[in-house]
Amino acid sequence: PQALWIDSPPSPVSQLDVTALMIEHDLGDTAHLLECAARLSSQQWTAPIRPGQTVLDWGGAEPSVGAVLGAIVWSKQVWLATIAGDDFPARASTQSADAVALAAFHVDVGKHWRTTVSEYSAAGRLGDTVIDALCETPESFPLYGIVAHVLTYSAHRRELARTMLAEHGIDAGLGDPLDWMRS
């Protein structure tokens, strides 16, 4: 056979929440990349090795390792503010002088993100819609769409960061969730 299937025993506990798994992987992999980036000099952290690189128009340019990793953290802040109805967060909080400072901030933002999504999920409210007044023209987004958006663009940015770190001579691994689950 080319593969074997092993059934899991029936469980009275609900099956593993794939969204929660992806959020944990996102936070863990981002922490790993920040740990790798801590080996960069301050010049390498801010070096514009991809001038003009823009992931999302509203997010601005992300030409350096620091800018890309900062955008991963900042985007969670933006969406947390949207969900809570808070003011648009200043980008300065994620434009840290180094990876160590950003990593510490990431821990706090990550906890808030994990808790927020978990609470809405447990309450069965991921289908709720948020009218985002932070957008230039207010838009509406279902919460599950916000989570999908954050995870999608975070994954994209993590791969950009991996490539950029490699250009600085740092191997950050593949970021494969299967490898992460084994560690």
Model-derived features: positions:
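Short, contiguous alpha-helical
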Residues: 1-7, 16, 20-40, 44-92, ...
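A general structural signal marking secondary-structure boundaries and capping sites
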Residues: 37, 41, 117-124
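Helix-adjacent hinge/juxtasegments
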Residues: 85-122
